Every structure is written in C-alpha cells, then in structure tokens.
Amino acid sequence: IKMIATKTNYAHYLYDERVGIKEKEYRCNVPWGGIILETKDNYLVLGEMDKKTSVPHCLQIPGGGIDEKDICNGIVKVSQTIKRELEEEIHLNLDDINYEIKYIEIPDEERHTYGFIAIGNLEITKEELQKHFEEYKKSLIKNNLEIEFNKLVFLEKSNAIEELNMLKNPKRPYLSNLIKKIVIGDEKND
C-alpha cells in the first residue's frame, strides 16, 4: 500500500478524534498500527487507556500512530510502529511473538484513520501476562513515567463478542468488528 503522509500536530489529531472534522480536506487521516494478542489459554487482550490519555478509559488493542522513528528513507514501517507501541503499553517484544498483519481499517465519515492490525499469539497465559503487566506498571509509577494502559482486559475468545458488549467503557470504533472477524474467522476454520 502506498500513501502520501504529511506531518500534523497533536492538537489537529485530538480535535478530529474528539470533535470530528467534516470537511474532507481538513481531516486528520492518521495511519496507525496495532496488534490484538491471544494468550495460549485463548484470551484476547485489550487495554484500558489511562485517564491522562487522549481517550480516557477507552478500550483498544495495543497500538498507536506512526512516529518519525517508524519511517526509514521515506517508507513507513508499520511493524516498527506495532513493536514500539507494544513495548510502551504492555512491555512485550514483538520479535518474541508469532504475528501477522491481517486487517486494514479504511477511513470513513466517522473515523479518519488507516489502521494496520496484526494478530499475535502469545506463549504465556492470561495470568502470566497479567502479572507481567502489573510489574511493568509498578515500574512506570516508581520511575514517574507515562502510563498508557491503566489495566489489561481479557476476553475469553469463545465468548469475546458478548463479553465486549457487556463492558461499559468507551471502545475504539474498530474494536467490535475486529473481535467479530477474529471469532467468526476461527469458527469458519473449525
């Protein structure tokens, strides 16, 4: 996929994210990369955004916008974005995860983003990941560093759609359809 990107500022992004820009030529069509993780005991992993982030308490997958560090010789390395965000938000190394970019989010009237979404399979359980995350969060607090995910949310894959719908948190617009595609896709493969 080829696209031409122009640098903007955070205020432009936040305004479009929170209020929305109707005029097509002024929209902030942000490219981003993310990964939905599945533990070895069949839980899908989401994060609840911290209260100090752009969308407080919102549920999303680990991921975020393209950063200058993700661009090499004018080429955006989406896997580098995913790697960086996964490290920042959960403190996992993408190099240790079997993953594949499988889904693309295209901008529409409501959400002005290009999302490149990977699925990653972890070799640890829900409990092991939870313990890892809690230790990481303590380290961030101790060192007065930014917390992006306040907590992890685990959805049992076989019941993920229902569990997601029961949660009262705001959710990124792509999340419900992504979970459905993953669950239904696996049902088709059974």
What do these predicted ranges mean?
Residues I1-I61, G65-R84, H91-D190:
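N-terminal leader/linker segments that precede catalytic domains of diphosphate-processing enzymes
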